Amino acid sequence: MLAWQDVGAKAAPSHHKISFSVLDILDPQKFTRAALPPVRLAALEAKKSLEEVEAGQDACSGNPIGSQETPDAVGRGIDPGSPVEGSEAEEEEEAEDAGRAHQPERWQGVHEGSPEARAVAVGTEESGAEGLPASPGSPGSPRPRRRRAESSCAKPRRARTAFTYEQLVALENKFRATRYLSVCERLNLALSLSLTETQVKIWFQNRRTKWKKQNPGADGAVQAGGGAPQPGTPGAVAGGGGSATGSSPGPPVPGALPYQTFPTYPATNVLFPAASFPLTTAANGSPFTPFLGPSYLTPFYAPHL
């Protein structure tokens, strides 16, 4: 009987409280005690495990028959066959105590199951969510918004030219006359419309691209057909007008333009100096005979003596 009392006396101070047991709930220091430092906690656990081993050895040596119950087990209402010390609940509690010892200082003095602990845990999660971006793979996290490129790194775009109605009409008329401008024509057109040469050049490039898309293959046909007649002959004007209005869908070519045609002069108004070429060769069938009348075959001045 004394052996049973000794075993009960040794086992009583070494009992371990579970977080959901009656003793833990009724503990007056549940919400006020501070968490132990890791070194002290490790020493306490080592001492506790040593006492549990000694108590288990005494219980095994004094109680060979498993049907008998110890006074401590009777008082606590625990089955002697169930593992009192070293159970899974105890191991979980020890792991929780070790993890609680490594928490920040604000966890000290706060029990795990208390409302204060839940509030601290929620605050920690919120601060972690604000400090670290949510992973794109998690189902509950919103998709990270794609950040727009900074304005300093972006290449500045060229401002679009706003042409007036008069400028557009003049440019269209010029494009109908000719699709390719020379340097002088481009300069004169830009000065007359109060534009820059670059603006006129870019407008013509865009207009040619649009015309080629609307009329595929027409540009090469117009250039090949218009190369035969000379611009000074009447056939060139007629051919140009026919190609514009006939089979070729190119822009119409005006019949009389100052920079495309040459004025014709009668033969009587053309004056050639007599000393520029010999009149005998002109009279004998030279290439200038069609341009000279019979009155111009004689010199205009009397020969010097």
Curated annotation (Swiss-Prot):
Tissue expression summary: Expression detected in the brain, testis and spleen. In the testis, expressed in the germ cells of the seminiferous epithelium, predominantly in elongating spermatids and spermatozoa. Expressed throughout the brain with highest levels in regions of the cerebral cortex, hippocampus, diencephalon, pons, medulla and cerebellum.
Gene Ontology MF terms: DNA binding; DNA-binding transcription factor activity, RNA polymerase II-specific
DNA-binding region in chain numbering: 156-215
Bias (Low complexity): 129-140
Primary location class: nucleus
Chain segments carrying region Disordered: 51-158, 210-257
Compositional bias per record (Basic and acidic residues), positions renumbered to this chain: 97-115
PTM comment text: Phosphorylated by HIPK2 in vitro.
PANTHER family xrefs: HOMEOBOX PROTEIN NKX, NK1 TRANSCRIPTION FACTOR-RELATED PROTEIN 2
Subunit and partners: Interacts (via the homeodomain) with HIPK1, HIPK2, and HIPK3.
Family listed: Belongs to the NK-1 homeobox family.
Protein name: NK1 transcription factor-related protein 2
Lineage, broadest ranks: Eukaryota, Metazoa, Chordata, Craniata, Vertebrata
